[in-house]
């Protein structure tokens, strides 16, 4: 029900934006758009020394991305679309654990031969700030990183705002409500390892201050409801290496 509601909302929003575009706005919305197709061939071999079954599987993945530009005006609107397809190529009986991070499983525990998912994120831009809401978010923050270490990318559902109104300072905040795993086509609540329940509220806020071209200071606060709160302090320093070093 939640996924259907989100899809309907995104479709209605996209339609509303499209009907209200001027010819100039359409040019920026379309001409600044990008369409890309990514392909990944992945062989996974896990030798389980703890006593469980080994995992040996081979699969092919496809990822189609459409990233629109923004409409003209004080507030610009856009939409990003994403589709992912997985094809299971090989992996015999006993080589596919029912619970894994590579390919989804059927009810009998065997690997799905094909699986697919699609999503969308609507976005708005005002001055040097952007707001995004949808189920294709891939944050890359000290307190939350979308994992891309398997055949398909992990994606999150929720809302994020990024502001660069102040020179050399990037502020980020938002709320994540669910996550789609790398071996899944469905979204679930967020959790931690070993937990028996999930949460639909991961709230965060923070910023990156670029002190100079080589030094960045970071602070982020995050809270996963019913699980934990976190304060993160970071320092990123780039040390240039030249031929004279």
Report residues per predicted region.
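Outer-membrane beta-barrel translocator domains and adjoining extracellular loop/strand segments
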Residues: 48-53, 90-95, 142-151, 182-190, ...
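Sequence/structural signature of outer-membrane beta-barrel proteins
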Residues: 42-48, 84-88, 138-147, 176-182, ...
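Beta-barrel outer-membrane channel/assembly domains of diderm bacteria
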Residues: 16-138, 163
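Repeated loop/turn-to-beta-strand initiation elements of outer-membrane beta-barrel proteins
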Residues: 35, 73-77, 128-132, 168-172, ...
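Outer-membrane beta-barrel domain signature
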Residues: 47-55, 105-113, 144-150, 190-198, ...
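Feature captures outer-membrane beta-barrel proteins of Gram-negative bacteria and organelles
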Residues: 62-69, 120-126, 157-166, 194-213, ...
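Transmembrane beta-barrel strands of outer-membrane/channel proteins
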Residues: 37-41, 79-83, 131-135, 173-177, ...
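Solvent-exposed loop/turn segments connecting transmembrane beta-strands
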Residues: 56, 126, 138, 150-153, ...
């Amino acid at each position: 029900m939640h996924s259907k509601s989100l899809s309907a909302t995104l479709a209605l929003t996209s339609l509303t934006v499209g009907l209200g575009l001027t010819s100039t706005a359409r040019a920026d919305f379309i001409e600044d758009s990008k369409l890309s197709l990514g392909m990944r061939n992945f062989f996974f071999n896990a030798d389980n020394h703890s006593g469980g079954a080994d995992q040996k599987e081979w699969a092919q993945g496809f990822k189609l991305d459409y990233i629109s530009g923004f409409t003209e005006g004080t507030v610009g609107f856009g939409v990003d679309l994403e589709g992912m397809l997985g094809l299971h190529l090989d992996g015999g009986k006993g080589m596919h654990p029912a619970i894994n991070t590579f390919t989804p499983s059927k009810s009998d525990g065997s690997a799905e031969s094909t699986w697919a998912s699609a999503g969308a994120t609507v976005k708005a831009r005002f001055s040097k700030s952007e707001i995004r809401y949808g189920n294709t978010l891939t944050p890359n923050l000290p307190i939350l990183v979308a994992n891309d270490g398997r055949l398909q990318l992990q994606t999150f559902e929720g809302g994020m705002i990024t502001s660069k109104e102040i020179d050399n300072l990037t502020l980020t905040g938002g709320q994540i409500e669910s996550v789609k795993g790398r071996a899944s086509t469905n979204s679930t609540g967020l959790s931690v390892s070993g937990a028996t329940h999930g949460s639909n509220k991961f709230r965060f806020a923070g910023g990156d201050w670029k002190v100079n071209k080589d030094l960045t200071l970071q602070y982020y606060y995050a809270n996963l409801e019913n699980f934990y709160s976190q304060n993160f302090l970071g320092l990123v320093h780039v040390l240039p290496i030249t031929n004279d070093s």
